[in-house]
């Protein structure tokens, strides 16, 4: 069975850091497009950036070849520079022996990276990239909503 080629654009936003936050993803495959977004009452920008990637990859039922555009160097570097693999090897500790932040989200991401063939592409945020700008609008709209749920993994 051949893999579908999927293009994903993601962004996360936080109004204050920590503060209310939102995430968004635009997914394209075979001429179809889908927008996903959500948010939490109290979270961080990095959690929202990771969650945007997670939610997009979790939405893909079958293994896919994914080209993922993000403005988050944190997410991209964690995967491409093998920080994630190192954190796992070190019992979820950083190089200076501190607990890895956002471990709950990283642990959800690991099997998705094994399931899908994901290639990250960095885009400069707020530089006029149409899909990144659209994701930013969606993420900010989510962060601005009233009655957002609590982020179960956020710790101050």
Swiss-Prot record:
<dbReference type="InterPro" id="IPR012337">
    <property type="entry name" value="RNaseH-like_sf"/>
</dbReference>
<feature type="binding site">
    <location>
        <position position="71"/>
    </location>
    <ligand>
        <name>Mg(2+) 1</name>
    </ligand>
</feature>
<feature type="domain" description="RNase H type-1">
    <location>
        <begin position="2"/>
        <end position="144"/>
    </location>
</feature>
<comment type="subunit">
    <text>Monomer.</text>
</comment>
<comment type="function">
    <text>Endonuclease that specifically degrades the RNA of RNA-DNA hybrids.</text>
</comment>
<feature type="binding site">
    <location>
        <position position="136"/>
    </location>
    <ligand>
        <name>Mg(2+) 2</name>
    </ligand>
</feature>
<feature type="binding site">
    <location>
        <position position="49"/>
    </location>
    <ligand>
        <name>Mg(2+) 1</name>
    </ligand>
</feature>
<dbReference type="GO" id="GO:0003676">
    <property type="term" value="F:nucleic acid binding"/>
</dbReference>
<dbReference type="InterPro" id="IPR050092">
    <property type="entry name" value="RNase_H"/>
</dbReference>
<keyword id="KW-0479">Metal-binding</keyword>
<keyword id="KW-0460">Magnesium</keyword>
<dbReference type="Pfam" id="PF00075">
    <property type="entry name" value="RNase_H"/>
</dbReference>
<dbReference type="GO" id="GO:0004523">
    <property type="term" value="F:RNA-DNA hybrid ribonuclease activity"/>
</dbReference>
<dbReference type="InterPro" id="IPR022892">
    <property type="entry name" value="RNaseHI"/>
</dbReference>
<keyword id="KW-0540">Nuclease</keyword>
<comment type="similarity">
    <text>Belongs to the RNase H family.</text>
</comment>
<feature type="binding site">
    <location>
        <position position="11"/>
    </location>
    <ligand>
        <name>Mg(2+) 1</name>
    </ligand>
</feature>
<dbReference type="InterPro" id="IPR036397">
    <property type="entry name" value="RNaseH_sf"/>
</dbReference>
<protein>
    <recommendedName>
        <fullName>Ribonuclease H</fullName>
        <ecNumber>3.1.26.4</ecNumber>
    </recommendedName>
</protein>
<keyword id="KW-0963">Cytoplasm</keyword>
<dbReference type="GO" id="GO:0000287">
    <property type="term" value="F:magnesium ion binding"/>
</dbReference>
<keyword id="KW-0255">Endonuclease</keyword>
<dbReference type="GO" id="GO:0005737">
    <property type="term" value="C:cytoplasm"/>
</dbReference>
<feature type="binding site">
    <location>
        <position position="11"/>
    </location>
    <ligand>
        <name>Mg(2+) 2</name>
    </ligand>
</feature>
<dbReference type="GO" id="GO:0043137">
    <property type="term" value="P:DNA replication, removal of RNA primer"/>
</dbReference>
<keyword id="KW-0378">Hydrolase</keyword>
<dbReference type="InterPro" id="IPR002156">
    <property type="entry name" value="RNaseH_domain"/>
</dbReference>
